[in-house]
Amino acid sequence: MAVTKEDVIDFIAGMSVLELSELIGEFEEKFGVSAAAPVAVAAAGVAAEAVEEKTEFDVILASAGSEKIKVIKEVRAITGLGLKEAKSLVESAPAALKEGVSKDEAAELKAKLEAVGATAEVK
C-alpha cells in the first residue's frame, strides 16, 4: 500500500514542535533549500513609494484679487472663521485655507475661490 499525501499530512500534524523543527532542518540539508522567507530588495520598496498617489492636499489662497470682499465672504464660508479672522487671512495671502483635504474637496474649494476672483493653489 502506497503512502498518500493525506497520510503524510496527518503524520506531520501529530508531531511536536521540536520534531517539526528537526524535520525542517533535515529537509533543508537534504534538498539544499532554506525555510527562511525571501527578503525583498530595498530598491523595489523605493519604486513602490514613488508610485503611491498623494491622498491629502492643502488649499492655498495665493492672492485675493480685485474682489476682496467677495473673497473674504467665501473664505468665511469655507473655513467657518469670523469676519475679522477671515479678513486677516485674506490680507496675509499667500496663506493656507484648508489642510489635509481630499483631492475632490481641494478642487472644489479652489473653484469656489477662483469664481469670486481669488487665485488659489492646491498642493
Curated annotation (Swiss-Prot):
Keyword field: Ribonucleoprotein, Ribosomal protein
Which Gene3D superfamilies is this protein grouped with? 3.30.1390.10, Single helix bin
* Any one annotated GO CC term: cytosolic large ribosomal subunit
Q: Which residues form the signal peptide?
A: none
Q: Does the keyword Lyase apply?
A: no
Give the record's GO biological process terms: translation
The terms under GO molecular function for this entry are: mRNA binding; structural constituent of ribosome
In terms of NCBIfam families, this protein maps to: L12
Q: How is this protein organized at the quaternary level?
A: Homodimer. Part of the ribosomal stalk of the 50S ribosomal subunit. Forms a multimeric L10(L12)X complex, where L10 forms an elongated spine to which 2 to 4 L12 dimers bind in a sequential fashion. Binds GTP-bound translation factors.
Role description? Forms part of the ribosomal stalk which helps the ribosome interact with GTP-bound translation factors. Is thus essential for accurate translation.
Similarity comment: Belongs to the bacterial ribosomal protein bL12 family.
Q: What is this protein called?
A: Large ribosomal subunit protein bL12
Q: Which organism is it from?
A: Desulfotalea psychrophila (strain LSv54 / DSM 12343)
Gene that encodes the chain: rplL
